[in-house]
């Protein structure tokens, strides 16, 4: 958001200070926009725009607290150019889902070791490389939030679908144990699907999945 509730506290405190008759010397108030979506306002500030030498960050969610620092952020856009690959004869679609994880803010909650469903899905797919064709994968909905829900559709050899789903369920049981303290309600599902369409070529699908597994998540 451009102005969330926590920012509102800081704005109110700053305006109150500017309106007061306190003998503080010169005080400047700095308000920026789009803090959650790219720091556009802060990035547009040019040298000399403000004269003050000391900056107090009033972006706290609690009155009476002042931050001397904040969580950093990095946005990465990765593009994988792939060739559409026809579905192999005898392969059928299976839909996989990891959902209802707790999620959380990528700054405030990143140290709580919560489940990232994108990486959980990628871990399973990595363990099954060579046993499927990737049709699609989608996870997360905000760049500053830990992914709560992820789904993937893969093509699996028809005579291995039951085994593939069984292996996914066994993987799910292990993950539930791994995150039983932080994400007790995380859910998993695997079922046959009527999805149709080409697959991602196997080499790019492999690189894509390996990249998702390798990307750092957490502190």
Residue ranges of each PLM-predicted region?
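Residues forming anionic-ligand binding surfaces in small-molecule and nucleic-acid pockets
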Residues: 1-4, 89-107
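Acidic/histidine-rich catalytic neighborhood of metal-dependent amide-processing enzymes
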Residues: 2-85, 89, 135
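Alpha-helix capping and helix-loop boundary segments enriched in small/acidic/polar residues
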Residues: 2-5, 108-112, 141-142
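Short beta-strand-to-loop capping motifs
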Residues: 98, 154-158
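Catalytic-loop motifs flanking and including active-site residues across diverse enzymes
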Residues: 6-13, 117-121, 150
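FAD-binding subdomain of flavoenzyme oxidoreductases
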Residues: 67, 77-79, 95-100, 107-111
């Amino acid at each position: 958001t451009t102005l969330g509730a926590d920012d509102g506290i800081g704005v109110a405190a700053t305006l109150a200070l500017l309106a007061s008759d306190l003998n503080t010397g010169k005080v400047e108030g700095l308000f920026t926009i789009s803090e959650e979506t790219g720091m556009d306002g802060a990035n547009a500030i040019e040298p000399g725009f403000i004269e003050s030498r000391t900056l107090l960050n009033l972006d706290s969610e609690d009155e009476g607290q002042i931050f001397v620092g904040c969580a950093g952020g990095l946005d990465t856009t990765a593009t994988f150019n792939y060739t559409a690959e026809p579905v192999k004869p005898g392969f059928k679609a299976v839909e996989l889902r990891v959902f209802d994880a707790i999620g959380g803010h990528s700054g405030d909650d990143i140290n709580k070791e919560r489940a990232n469903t994108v990486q959980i899905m990628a871990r399973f797919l990595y363990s099954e490389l060579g046993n499927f064709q990737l049709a699609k994968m989608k996870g997360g909905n905000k760049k500053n939030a830990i992914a709560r829900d992820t789904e993937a559709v893969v093509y699996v050899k028809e005579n291995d679908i039951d085994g593939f789903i069984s292996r996914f369920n066994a993987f799910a049981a292990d993950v539930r144990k791994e995150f039983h303290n932080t994400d007790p309600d995380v859910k998993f599902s695997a079922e046959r699907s009527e999805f149709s369409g080409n697959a991602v070529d196997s080499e790019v699908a492999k690189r894509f999945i390996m990249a998702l597994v390798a990307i750092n998540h957490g502190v």
